[in-house]
């Protein structure tokens, strides 16, 4: 299958997202090209990955790199959101420094969104910036978190509160890796794909309503959906690299979603990121309806599609008890979009008509959350 290329152009950097099959088994050439090396003489790569990916895919990547005389330093962390922590970051940094990797060497993030955020953050601060390449292994990472240069870790006060903007040298997206992805993880990534349609591409949402099931199978429809998603995000990042304006639209569903992830202590048995975003997008639409911005009919349409894809749509779908509304509000208060203590949400005026709403009244959000919690019973 022919590879596709999406180019990300930001102020001081330009890089490619290479999308196709069997890319891990031939990664050396692309890495050499991205690092502008004529040869790999004395080049060393730190491969940051997790226990799940390492058990299935790491050997293939290492064989390809070793065959091309590239010295690798594998750094394997526990799979899951809990690895986006100071302690795990310290472990990754120490292993890279202990191996005496230099600024001109490279960190490869070989995993999902957690690994991309963690590995990218480490690369951005070690020796004030090392080369960095993303090799995303989940749908969510391939269409979202690997594109645009956001890196970081979580805090006890909330998700992604500590991090940097740090663009990679390239993104190598091997769609074959998705064939080994657990169905739940694939569905979670699909939620982020739907998000792009709900932001300002109603035709893409309608296309997904018709073709969504085909995205779950390896083939041209999946490739088409991934390419379109990457291109959409790349275009927004090119116009607003540091999220001072329209890039905030990409946070549709994330204010409520991050609130729920914090409320569930990032426990994957209860909730994973894409599921939180799915519920968060429904909540954002419901809150918009409460403000008389949209019709409840649109909410039902989105719910119908999510349910067809076996995605959660309500707080009741989250196992276990949630904190009260006041506590949830403290999590929202830590949202990165908060400016001068004023709440900012991504709200909706219609299908594919999202907008940045500033100075959203706290009382309205609190009342809304109380209503949603009461529905759980």
Curated annotation (Swiss-Prot):
GO terms for biological process: amino acid biosynthetic process; aromatic amino acid family biosynthetic process; chorismate biosynthetic process. InterPro entries: Dehydroquinate_synthase, DHQ_synth_AroB, DHQ_synth_fam, DHQS/DOIS_N, DHQS_C. Its EC number is 4.2.3.4. Zn(2+) binds at residues 192, 254, 273. Its cofactor is Co(2+); Zn(2+); NAD(+). One of its GO terms (molecular function) is metal ion binding. Its main location: cytoplasm. This is 3-dehydroquinate synthase. The gene is aroB.
């Amino acid at each position: 299958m022919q590879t596709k290329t999406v180019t990300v152009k930001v102020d001081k950097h330009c890089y490619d997202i290479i999308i196709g099959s069997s890319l891990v088994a031939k990664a050396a050439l692309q890495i050499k090209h991205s690092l502008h090396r004529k040869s790999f003489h004395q080049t060393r790569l730190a491969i940051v990955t997790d226990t799940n990916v390492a058990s299935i895919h790491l050997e293939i990547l290492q064989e390809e790199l070793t065959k091309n005389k590239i010295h690798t330093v594998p750094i394997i962390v526990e799979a899951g959101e809990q690895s986006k922590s100071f302690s795990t970051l310290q472990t990754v940094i120490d292993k890279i420094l202990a191996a005496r990797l230099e600024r001109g060497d490279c960190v490869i993030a070989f995993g999902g969104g957690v690994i991309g955020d963690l590995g990218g953050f480490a690369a951005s601060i070690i020796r004030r910036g090392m080369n960095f390449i993303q090799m995303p292994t989940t749908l969510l990472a391939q269409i979202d978190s690997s594109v645009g240069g956001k890196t970081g870790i979580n805090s006890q006060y909330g998700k992604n509160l500590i991090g940097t903007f740090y663009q990679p040298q390239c993104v190598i997206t091997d769609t074959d890796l998705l064939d080994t992805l657990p169905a739940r993880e694939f569905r979670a990534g699909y939620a982020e794909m739907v998000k792009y349609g709900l932001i300002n591409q109603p035709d893409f949402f309608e296309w997904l309503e018709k073709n969504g099931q085909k995205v779950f199978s390896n083939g041209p429809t999946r490739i088409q959906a991934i390419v379109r998603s990457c291109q959409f995000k790349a275009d927004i990042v090119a116009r607003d690299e540091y999220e001072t304006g329209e890039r905030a639209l990409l946070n549709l569903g994330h204010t409520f979603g991050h609130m729920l992830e914090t409320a569930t202590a990032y426990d994957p048995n209860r909730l994973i990121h894409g599921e939180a975003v799915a519920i968060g997008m429904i909540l954002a639409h419901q809150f918009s309806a409460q403000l008389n911005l949209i019709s409840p009919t649109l909410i039902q349409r989105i719910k119908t599609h999510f349910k067809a894809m076996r995605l959660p749509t309500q707080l009741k779908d989250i196992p276990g008890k949630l904190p009260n509304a006041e506590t949830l509000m403290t999590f929202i208060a830590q949202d990165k979009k908060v400016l001068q203590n004023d709440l900012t949400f991504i709200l909706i005026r219609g299908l594919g008509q999202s907008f940045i709403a500033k100075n959203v009244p706290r009382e309205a959000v609190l009342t809304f959350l109380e209503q949603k919690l009461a529905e759980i019973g």
